[in-house]
Structure formats: C-alpha cells, structure tokens
Amino acid sequence: MSYKLYNDDCVNVCSQLPDDCIDLTITSIPFANLYTYSDDPRDFSNVKDLDEFFAQMNYLIPELYRITRPGRIIALHLMQIPTFKGRDGAMGLIDFRGMVIKAFQKHGWIFHGEITVFKDPQIEATRTKSASILWNSYKKFAEITRTGMPDYVVLMQKVEREDEWIHVTHDNIDD
C-alpha cells in the first residue's frame, strides 16, 4: 500500500495529477464564507457569497472527478450554514450540505451516502456564543432557539466505466 499527502492549494495539486489516480479523497471544504482561513484571494473562504463560492467550486469539482478512479469515493466534511438576524434578516440555516451534493451531482458524481457527526450542543454554545442555542435565550425567547448543529461527512462516488473498477476485497479473518 502506498499513499501520498499533499499540503498545497487543492486546485494546484489536482491540476498536476494524472487521470484516475486517486482512490480516496477526504477533505473538509471551506463552508463558503462562514470562516476565513487566510488572506489569499485564491482561498475558497474569501468569497463574498454562496454564488461566488460555487462558481469557484465549479473549477475544482470536475478536476476531482477526473483524478478519482472509477468507483471510488470522495468524503466531504460539511455543516449547515447558520444565518444571522443582523446580516441575513433572520436566524435560520442554509442547506449547504444539499447545495454541495447538487454541485457535485452536476459534474457526474453520485450521492453515495452520509455520516452524521453529532456534536455536544453545550460545547457548541460555549464556543460560538450563538444566541439561538444559549440557555439564557431559551429562558427568555424559546421561539428562537434551535438544536445543536451536527456535522456531516457526505460520500460522493465516481460511477463510470464499471468494467474498469478495481474491486476492493477483504480476506476472511476468521480462516
């Protein structure tokens, strides 16, 4: 078994890789402009809105498809994006998970499955200070409170050329 780890801009790395060379990609893509990771203008987190984010993703997603071997998976760590009353006019959620799935499907990927990663709402409340999850908000304005937000690992599969799939097999360990 061999593997390689890359620490570089994903668009740079993908463009240099040959076709059908990756068995598994595990990534946590930026959640649009929810967090800013650097001041680099190429950074996907430095977008002004979701439209700009998905316009940028439209360059990366086909490259990920090209370099992924047929039948293999990309695992995407995601979360829903909260909206804020001051910025967005109301507190709620944007279905970022669904938007990412649709963006990948547009480029030929198949939605293969997902894993829900439940998080402790008390830790989330302490970390984010989000009024919608704080106990004090619940006591005063219960109608604005929500549950804690889980993360998701969305699994997308490259389904093409099934006759070329290299099947994964496991020896029976009971023998």
Task: Name the predicted role of every residue range.
Residues 1-175:
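Core catalytic lobe of class I
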